[in-house]
């Protein structure tokens, strides 16, 4: 479905969260890509953080941003695989008030178009 060009563009303030036990500011390519894309699309970077694969740490960072009026959206990368250390979805469930039914399926379908069956390795 195309974007409705008659609607005004409304930029949002986005916080980028990288969840990883190994990434640092110098090698967080996924976080860098997200920042580049949000800026090129006209949005603002509200904040950025890298946290370990620990549910309490993730929740703490999310709560900080949820309570920050200068953050409209949080986009996360990492910690969504199927290993025991991948706990990002569970951490998000602890702070989310509403689920968006179908979003995960749509995201995986779009991913499947690009990376094939490897998309099943992400939740």
Spans of model-derived segments:
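Non-catalytic beta/alpha edge segments that cap or flank active sites
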Residues: 1-123
